[in-house]
């Protein structure tokens, strides 16, 4: 696991071989075939350029972009993956999955800085390799890392406060990718 210390206290833990390829392939197929995928409207009413699914503890709701994402119950596969990531860092009660069907599916520059969310996010990539790009809010400093089949990134420290991240579109002919972002959602008081 490589530790990348970022400006203003952001931390990235990066392991491009967190899962062996055969296990990553198995997880990819199970999640692709059995998750409750949906495409939701995003900002300004346009459909999000990816499919999403939400899983977690009973009663957990993650609100972003003005939409409530109610967690479905954990699947055995997601619990198995969650335990592997928690062994590295963090405790998680929610997982937002993003399914990128081609290079045209993307996630724009954003920070996961909602007040009800903890500051540690475990992000596992399965399937095709894409570019994970980060940008500092003030200095505009950037960095890109390849996220391929079995890559784990842990975003921690002040990452969400001072940095934004994205999965940009690509014209390259890439296959499908599933990204799992494990989070700790604080229940409302």
Where are these regions (language model features)?
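Non-heme Fe(II) oxygenase metal-center motifs and adjacent flexible, charged/small-residue loops
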Residues: 1-189
């Amino acid at each position: 696991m490589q530790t990348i210390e970022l400006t203003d206290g952001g931390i990235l833990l990066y392991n491009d071989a967190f899962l062996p390829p055969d296990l990553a392939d198995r997880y990819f197929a199970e999640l692709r075939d059995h998750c409750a995928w949906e495409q939701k409207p995003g900002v300004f009413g346009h459909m999000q350029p990816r499919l999403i699914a939400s899983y977690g503890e009973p009663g957990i709701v993650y609100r972003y972009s003005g939409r409530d994402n109610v967690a479905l119950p954990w699947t055995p596969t997601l619990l198995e993956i969650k335990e592997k990531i928690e062994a590295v860092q963090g405790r998680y009660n929610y997982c937002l999955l993003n399914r990128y069907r081609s290079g045209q599916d993307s996630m724009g520059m954003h920070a996961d800085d909602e007040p009800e969310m903890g500051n540690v996010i475990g992000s596992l990539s399965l399937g095709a390799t894409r570019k994970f790009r980060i940008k500092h809010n003030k200095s505009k400093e950037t960095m890109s890392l390849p996220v391929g089949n079995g890559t784990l990134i842990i975003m921690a420290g002040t990452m969400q406060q001072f940095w934004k991240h994205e999965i940009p579109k690509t014209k390259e002919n890439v296959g499908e990718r599933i990204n799992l972002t494990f989070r700790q959602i604080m229940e409302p008081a």
